[in-house]
From Swiss-Prot:
This is Iron-responsive element-binding protein 2. The gene is IREB2. Belongs to the aconitase/IPM isomerase family. RNA-binding protein that binds to iron-responsive elements (IRES), which are stem-loop structures found in the 5'-UTR of ferritin, and delta aminolevulinic acid synthase mRNAs, and in the 3'-UTR of transferrin receptor mRNA. Binding to the IRE element in ferritin results in the repression of its mRNA translation. Binding of the protein to the transferrin receptor mRNA inhibits the degradation of this otherwise rapidly degraded mRNA. PANTHER family: ACONITASE/IRON-RESPONSIVE ELEMENT FAMILY MEMBER. GO terms for molecular function: 4 iron, 4 sulfur cluster binding; aconitate hydratase activity; iron-responsive element binding; metal ion binding. Binds 1 [4Fe-4S] cluster per subunit. [4Fe-4S]-binding affects RNA-binding activity, thereby inhibiting activity of the protein.
Amino acid sequence: MDAPSAGYAFEYLIETLNDSSHKKFFNVPRLGGTKYDVLPYSIRVLLEAAVRNCDGFLMKKEDVMNILDWKTKQSNVEVPFFPGRVLLQDFTGIPAMVDFAAMREAVKTLGGDPKKVHPACPTDLTVDHSLQIDFNKCAIQNAPNPGGGDLQKAGKLSPLRVQPKKLPCRGQTACRGSCDSGDLGRNSGKFSSQIENTPILCPFHLQPVPEPETVLKNQEVEFGRNRERLQFFKWSSRVFKNVAVIPPGTGMAHQVNLEYLSRVVFEEKDLLFPDSVVGTDSHITMVNGLGILGWGVGGIETEAVMLGLPVSLTLPEVVGCELTGSSNPFVTSIDVVLGITKHLRQIGVAGKFVEFFGSGVSQLSIVDRTTIANMCPEYGAILSFFPVDNVTLKHLEYTGFNKAKLKSMETYLKAVKLFRNDQDNSGEPEYSQVIQINLNSIVPSVSGPKRPQDRVAVTDMKSDFQACLNEKVGFKGFQIAAEKQNDTVSIHYEGSEYKLSHGSVVIAAVISCTNNCNPSVMLAAGLLAKKAVEAGLRVKPYIRTSLSPGSGMVTHYLSSSGVLPYLSKLGFEIVGYGCSTCVGNTAPLSEAVLNAVKQGDLVTCGVLSGNKNFEGRLCDCVRANYLASPPLVVAYAIAGTVNIDFRTEPLGTDPTGKNIYLHDIWPSREEVHQIEEEHVVLSMFKALKEKIEMGNKRWNSLEAPDSVLFPWDLKSTYIRCPSFFDKLTKEPVALQPIENAHVLLYLGDSVTTDHISPAGSIARSSAAAKYLTNRGLTPREFNSYGARRGNDAVMTRGTFANIKLFNKFIGKPAPKTIHFPSGQTLDVFEAAELYQKEGIPLIILAGKKYGSGNSRDWAAKGPYLLGVKAVLAESYEKIHKDHLIGIGIAPLQFLPGENADSLGLSGRETFSLTFPEELSPGVTLNIKTSTGKIFSVIASFENDVEIILYKHGGLLNFVARKFS
């Protein structure tokens, strides 16, 4: 399906830019005059996209005028939005690209040309969610293979170059090489040599490997275990136009998006328009710090955009956040983020845009802004937007942006009034609500111990943690008896004795794009590590430390500035690029620590410079998890506890016994900025771009087919041609009635997408496990549903397989239901399979907020493949309802005030309904049951586009027919 041509209804607004480039653009301010001038900048971007894509069908003139009239229409109307591009990461990219591959098969079957099937929208796919930390300075457990590849092909492991001073722990124990206090403070040459040759152990052969090869070894294993998926991605990049794959080892999706993929202003056939992006990762919002409108959406919406269709959103309220003042020298971007997070959560910004303005905005660098924008999902906003200003232009110039294009960009943005002049506040937009935050009021802080919004000033950390021990179990409390709060447990580790207590730090990770995009906080961590090592401080060896950058850029400036060896000396060595500890892929703790935690029922702590700290996320046995800036992560690792007052208690002592306090080693802002200016330079950004464009040796040498149709491997348990198109006809058939449908499940309120399609591990007793076992896999090789999204057989069997699913037919939480013709209680999949063999259609009964939670495409695809024709609920989460329509399931809604109970429905009846020939949005339908009861429901379609998609049997069928 072709993308809409530019501005059918508004071609009269096309003008030529008044500069040497002579590019074309839509002069949208002409449309609205003073009404345009008071629109928030983010709404102006929505309006430009609407004007440019107005075709009278997918984007109507009424939609354009609704956006222009934002002040009165906000929160009341749905509007379509055509983003400029799409960003996928590998977990969600697999099902999207598998669907495209299957669509080629379907188009060929219908007699069309499969070579015509391409994404209409530029699509970038980054492979960043497959990294696991198999190698660091410790011996860890042999890891299962989550990607379908052969680990034996991951590359021969390097031999030991330097023997360890002490024997490592054996078996399942995880440990790190000793940090001899006598080594601290040595001359730089000897110091660097010692770090370079620190041995680690191969987790598969218990063979030591030299530390500098840590990253390479993790990447080797990553390519080995994910070979099957990577070959499919490479095929996709070869045969599909508009698809670019960023190979493993390059960086996280949103990090690469910021550093490499962002345009700020798009240029397409000499037409200029604002860059915008949607993607399948909630933290894609980072780019809003660069003045690029972007947010996360679900898999089906992403596929729709790739096929030239818009995403739909409620015209949002826009909260104006005025920043005033300047921050304290000891306050990092993370402190600013956590301060803003708490403030915005308190006032409530869920489902809203946040837009920053005020004198304080110019005090923030681009990396500060992107850090704040990246955290917006944690405080509930759709996005947090920083309009382009002089700071943005200076950043782009600094990073090597073409000067001629930069000048053209500035001219264009000023012409359409998308450039914010920080010297002139006379034309500030009007907002739904304005809040003020004085940057001077923000103090250094951390966030935790269980939620990112629970901010704690560092000065209050000790008293707050002690209060958490006292409080009842809840959002903050652990309810530890007073007489047990001072308990300690001794452990023997690497020949030394240590004591663990409540508050002991056992995981410390400098990780996540939240900080890796910000050189100042990363360099501050490195400088603090340098001063700590020079002062003779160390990190206790049982603490699991790691440094996982968002991209190679971070490695470059940490290395070139000379601070990387000091981080490594404290245990913070680079373990690889991608999501690791942040998403729970941390190496296991040692048995000594685990036993001590269990013995003393200790509340031990993880300290992470990421953006999520929900309980148990890092490790089940680590109950308290705190988000902190990178230098504070290093500081707490050195202290070994969060139960410390940095103002009055020392981190440790130097070799002479002198107390060393945090203020003794904390780098000044001037020091950090000096290092940043000297080492975060243009060459670094050029090197990153070259790395992406050239790929890497393993990716370049990876064999992949280049056939028009993908050669499906029938033995594969990861990638399979889905059955969505099995019954596809050249033309859509008339809407068929649903006759004598049985209820597959009778559910209550707040059924989440995780209840419907779990993403976690595959239970050994599940239908998916039986399928995998029959194909020769062991339970260790099952992996998770999330990793097998490219196999419809696994995902269909995993639908409604959540052990916490409460089906009223069963009366207790279990992934079971009743097959009424036989009376058997079966797994949901087994019952659905029987119904399909008997030719019986299915529906689902539900209460309020059906499909709430994270957007998940398989929460709609799975029920469809089970044979579900309709869902009848009291209310829906809108995104999930859109997904149901997009896959061909009718979303039916009880009349206001009615539900299954009030209508006397047991769910054991059969249900029949007929659709009118002219189905219209919100039409009332009559359902008749086998008991003779007749009641009315609402067909919950909101517009003509949704009805057209439903009549075609869903989005995929609609587009396949277009290509045919």
